[in-house]
From Swiss-Prot:
Pathway: Metabolic intermediate biosynthesis; 1-deoxy-D-xylulose 5-phosphate biosynthesis; 1-deoxy-D-xylulose 5-phosphate from D-glyceraldehyde 3-phosphate and pyruvate: step 1/1. It holds the Pfam family Transket_pyr. Its cofactor is Mg(2+); thiamine diphosphate. This is 1-deoxy-D-xylulose-5-phosphate synthase. GO terms for biological process: 1-deoxy-D-xylulose 5-phosphate biosynthetic process; isopentenyl diphosphate biosynthetic process, methylerythritol 4-phosphate pathway; terpenoid biosynthetic process; thiamine biosynthetic process. GO terms for molecular function: 1-deoxy-D-xylulose-5-phosphate synthase activity; magnesium ion binding; thiamine pyrophosphate binding. Binds 1 Mg(2+) ion per subunit. It catalyses: D-glyceraldehyde 3-phosphate + pyruvate + H(+) = 1-deoxy-D-xylulose 5-phosphate + CO2. Belongs to the transketolase family. DXPS subfamily. It comes from Shewanella baltica (strain OS195). The keyword Zinc does not apply. The gene is dxs. Homodimer. One of its GO terms (cellular component) is cytosol.
Length: 622
């Protein structure tokens, strides 16, 4: 259900940036107010990322007003904050479909709009992409401008500083907008600082500054004195020294909710030479009191009624796998103070809130710095501690070298609790946990476990905790557990051993992970044997051999890419044993999995019970 645009009379006149730029500047505050109200009601209908977008309304209006998008390139980092951008770039009438099957993509996506100049989803990529586009713009000589928008949270990633260091060295024309959305507006944001930013970005100041540099080039002592004087004057009101040292001209901070100040400052900065940083201060959840008070809790929301000023109550139900992990972590920390938990800015999502509160000295949030988080764990292991890295499958990709070089190569006992393994759903291809089994399986010294239910997950986490011969990983999906009876006592499982769950004939289904219930349902119609393999690596070779000897067809089932996954490991072992056998591999196809609800995606990929049965029957009919 789309919103009635007649309720937003000024916004109705700005369905595209070209239309926005036709409006008088005096109307921009009203555009921003109506855009915020539209976003509020739209996300209430569709669900989605919420607080970040409310904080970037004025910024988005100013950017599209000053810059000639899409000719000028605008790159958003991550994209959580880009909903207002989508609304202003011709997608207003489809906002109610965002994150839904066949609807708008959850993040800026090149295939969706010419205004989305770079597809995003993971943090820290915007400045590298913007630098490349700035270099290309200089080669084209067409007058194209390039802007990257990045949040303060993403500034903790090493890739950001690698890009800024390179940009400062090359000195191409580009603007980086640092959206600093801390919980409150900084004290030095206000009329004085806005005026200072406009003054320092103005033509007179910059001409004087650049001309002075040329004059002082032959007088190094006076040049150094002038430089220090300028830095001292700026340093009294601005925290830009770091960016200046990296080769950027720094302007700000200014109030990111003052659309007129943003427009005037950007107009001044638009034609400045070299790399520029505009530091703006915004408030997550701006304009909606519950989100302002709890921006983390309102980061992403289900469908809700904004007029109630609260999210819908969650229905009591099964715990999530993240909660199962969080409880296990607290239980084990009660027994062992050497357990140290590390997460790259995923405390809430990984189920670690209680642990962080109860065991603050054993909890480390490495921020959005996955490479650092993994090597930090390696260092802890060297010193005799028991590090546990809680990380999403899609983000572990970003620390692959550290996993190999710093952990596995040294056979360090680091436990990886890999959340969001398999189909994640609405966040789409940038967040599906499709590849972890494949990219870990080829690493020597790794033990990889895939639990079929919450009790097995708990026991596998304990198994990894006890395993000291090298790194281990337990990967589990997003969402609710299966309802299995949890055994509070923790027992280490025998490494590399699976269990037979159902005895049948002719067909043996070798299941890896939480698709076990669907495999068992499909097996009833086929009278097939079902095995809970438990371990992807080391594989239970004896059990695979037994199944191959006693069945005509083997079927492997996993919620991971078929290429290089657990099923590929079964085929490799059969070849090694010189046992030719008909094997059907069921899993994720060789494509990036689109967004939709987990249930929709699972059904479309034929990974539910009905689909597994259909795939097996089709294979048998060949």
């Amino acid at each position: 259900m789309s919103l009635d645009i007649s309720q937003f009379p000024v916004l109705a006149q700005a369905n595209t940036p070209n239309e926005l730029r036709q409006l008088p500047q005096a109307l921009l505050p009203q555009v921003a107010d109506e855009l915020r109200e539209f976003l509020l009601k739209s996300v209430g209908i569709s669900s989605g990322h919420f607080a970040s977008g409310l904080g970037t309304v004025e910024l988005t209006v100013a950017l599209h007003y000053v810059y000639n998008t899409p000719f000028d390139r605008l790159i958003w980092d991550v994209g959580h904050q880009a909903y207002p951008h989508k609304i202003l770039t011709g997608r207003r009438d489809k906002m109610h479909t965002i994150r839904q099957k066949d609807g708008l993509h959850p993040f800026p996506w090149r295939e969706e709009s010419e205004y989305d100049t770079f597809s995003v989803g993971h943090s820290g990529t915007s400045i590298s992409a913007a630098l490349a586009m700035a270099i290309a713009a200089e080669k084209e000589q067409a007058g194209r401008k390039v802007v990257a928008v990045i949040g303060d949270g993403a500034m903790t990633g090493g890739m950001v500083f690698e890009a800024m260091n390179h940009a400062g060295d090359l000195h191409n024309d580009m603007l980086v907008v640092l959206n600093d959305n801390e919980m409150s507006i900084s004290e030095n944001v206000g009329a004085l600082n806005n005026h200072l930013a406009q003054l320092m970005s103005g033509r007179f100041y910059t001409t004087l500054r650049e001309g002075g540099k040329k004059v002082l080039k032959g007088m190094p002592v006076i040049k150094e004195m002038a430089k220090r004087t300028e830095e001292h004057l700026k340093g009294m009101v601005v925290p830009g020294t770091l960016f200046e040292e990296l080769g950027f001209n720094y302007i700000g901070p200014i109030d990111g909710h003052d659309v007129d100040a943003l427009v005037e400052t950007m107009r001044n900065m638009r034609n400045l030479k070299g790399p520029q940083v505009l530091h703006i201060m915004t408030k997550k959840g701006r304009g909606y009191e519950p989100a302002e008070k709890d921006p983390i809790g309102w980061h992403a929301v289900p469908k809700f009624d904004p007029s109630l000023f609260k999210k819908p109550a969650t229905k009591p139900g099964l715990p999530t796998f993240s909660q199962v992990f969080g409880k296990w972590l607290c239980d084990i920390a009660e027994q062992d103070e050497k357990v140290l938990a590390i997460t790259p800015a995923m405390r809430e999502g990984s189920g670690m809130v209680e642990f962080s509160q109860r065991f603050p000295k054993q909890y480390f949030d490495a921020a959005i710095a996955e490479q650092h988080a993994v090597t930090l764990a390696a260092g802890f292991a060297c010193e005799g501690f028991k590090p546990v890295v809680a990380i999403y499958s899609t983000f572990l990709q970003r620390a692959y070298d550290q996993l190999i070089h710093d952990v596995a190569l040294q056979q360090l006992p680091v436990l990886f609790a890999i959340d969001r393994g398999g189909i994640v759903g609405a966040d789409g291809p940038t967040h599906q946990g499709a590849f972890d089994l494949s990219f870990m399986r080829c690493i020597p010294n790794m033990v990889i476990m895939a639990p079929s239910d919450e009790n097995e997950c708990r026991q596998m986490l304990y198994t990894g905790y006890c395993y000291d011969a090298g790194p281990s990983a337990v990967r589990y999906p997003r969402g609710s557990a299966t309802g299995a009876m949890q055994v509070e006592a923790m027992t280490a499982l025998p490494i590399g051993k699976g269990v037979i769950k159902r005895v049948g004939k002719r067909i043996a289904i070798l299941n890896f992970g939480t698709l076990l219930a669907s495999a068992l349902t499909a097996a009833e119609s086929l009278d097939a044997t079902v095995v809970d393999m438990r371990f992807v690596k080391p594989l239970d070779v004896d059990l695979v051999k037994e199944m191959a000897q006693t069945h005509e067809v083997l079927v492997t089932v996993e919620e991971n890419a078929i290429m290089g996954g657990a099923g590929a490991g079964v085929l490799e072992q059969l070849q090694k044993l010189r046992m030719p056998k008909a094997v059907l591999q069921i899993g994720l196809p060789d494509e990036f999995i689109k967004h939709g609800s987990p249930e929709e995606v699972t059904h479309d990929l034929q990974l539910d019970a009905e689909g597994i049965l259909a795939q097996i029957n089709a294979y048998l009919a060949q």
